[in-house]
Amino acid sequence: MRLRLSARIAAALAAITAVGLAACSTAAPSAPSASAADTTIPLLTVGLNNTEDGAPQTLDVTKAIGADYITVLGLETLMRFNAQGKVEPDLATSVTEPNPVTYVYHLRHGVRFWDGDPLTATDVAFSLNYDRANGSQVAFAYPSVKSITASGPYTVTVTLTHPDASWPYTPAEINSQIFEKKFYEAHKSTYGQAGTLVMGTGPWKIDSFDPTTGAELSANPHWWGGKVPIQRIKMTSFASATSEALAFRAGEIDLAPDVYTPLSFASTSGAKLLATPSCDIDIFIMHVTTAPWNDVHVRRAVAYALDRSAIMTAHGGYATPLYTLIPPQLMQNIASKSQIGSLLSSLPLYQYNLAKAKQELAESAYPHGFSASILEINDPTSLNEDQVIVAELQKIGIRLQIKAVTAADWTAVESGPASQRVSSETSASCFNPDPSAYYDLLGSANTAVGSWNVADYAPPAVDTLMADGLATSNPAQRFSTYSKLLGNLQTNIPDVGLYLSDATVALSTKFSAPGYSYWTSPFSSTGQPDFYLDLRPAK
């Protein structure tokens, strides 16, 4: 169905309040939710679909960010997100801000690693510095950090190079998991690998890991948060969504936390999916420093030619159209719904319009079309969506060839030298509810090897706006800056927003998941174990 512009804006605004996004808080309960702790689940079997991100070869998230589905259960963070997206203490009990560039985290006493050693500030500082080191796949989360030091046995001081309104979220993200320094130093060359594993403080101890078959975990009897409800977790890797769905139907797995093709998975598995709106995006990225993508009229033609409804159908439903790189709901903390609506009304949103697409292409250096290649991960969902994109663009004379590669090869290219990155349709996750959540896709800093500015879009004006957006916590000033940034992005359109995907999981009817939300979902990139802690046997 084709929607008028005003209807699309209304749909975008309706999504603003769907994901519970909220400002930071430093007061919190003493422990993560463990409402299922009065009941015991002997074994939970979990499926992992490796077709989208590829099977992680290590549990070291600096080398394999996709390992977070496993490590989130064992490696904790200083802070955490609650179900409403507010930041609360976790391994830290509180945080103080003596000045705009200094954050002092006061650690929880009595926390021990699985080997019995106490958690200290030295472990925390070492972990965070390791995560932010050059070449780390999660280093993008630390652009404003000057230093992280153990300023006392139980205090960690983070000093920023400049004020950063997004920093308070970072210690709650999967990009900031804490592990034991002593264990790492004893196993530097093999840390995270199958024979070595990792050493954490979390509710489940990782007992075994195999990149091909999966992982096994057991309840940590000494967890500081109390009794752990699930005694054992067995994670099994699957080579396809179909094989995972069939295993669910056969009762071989209880939980599929990573349902990428919701409609087909539900049909094959027989599962009634749990779904909640998210701020995870799917976008078509154009590498703006190579022809023909360096022609803005080509990029605008592509934006007009893509039929989001058809692409969402290929995805498998459970999605909402997206027209900007920054999802509108991420600005809820800095602007009112009416302000966001007025901003969207002022921007070119590139609603599906083949006539305008052809007009833009006629104004380009390629009025009769062109041939080009795009890079894609070789999994059914992505390829189905790409086939729709190919068919849509062919209508205006753009002939695309899909080059399908493994997830590892895709990552090597798209986070490799910026000049060699390739246009691609891909998905991305928001690690926090700040409008800067997708900065890793923009700016000169993220053209470095290991970073994710696939479009290689880094004009000085964008760098300046990105910096200005973080330099103050004043909502009005931030909204003004992000309005200008969105204006730049919508005018130059390096990335075409396609849709926001719901966070969908399949859960056996043997269990219930009260309070299911994006911020505590096992599908989420925020890195919380709460979904597992809150699981209950069905009544």
Please place each PLM-identified region on the residue numbering.
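N-terminal lobe/hinge region of extracytoplasmic solute-binding protein
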Residues: 47-98, 129, 199-200
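Extracytoplasmic/peripheral linker and loop segments enriched in polar/acidic and small residues
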Residues: 96, 350, 401-409, 439-509, ...
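Surface-exposed binding/hinge segments that line
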Residues: 96-98, 102-104, 140-185, 208
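Periplasmic-binding protein-like
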Residues: 170, 289, 293-334, 384-385, ...
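Gly/Pro-rich hinge or "lid" segments in bacterial periplasmic/extracellular proteins
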Residues: 173-227, 232
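Ligand-site clamp/hinge motif
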Residues: 220-266, 399
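Structural transition elements
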Residues: 319-360, 381-384
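Long beta-strand-rich cores associated with HINT superfamily self-processing modules
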Residues: 505-539
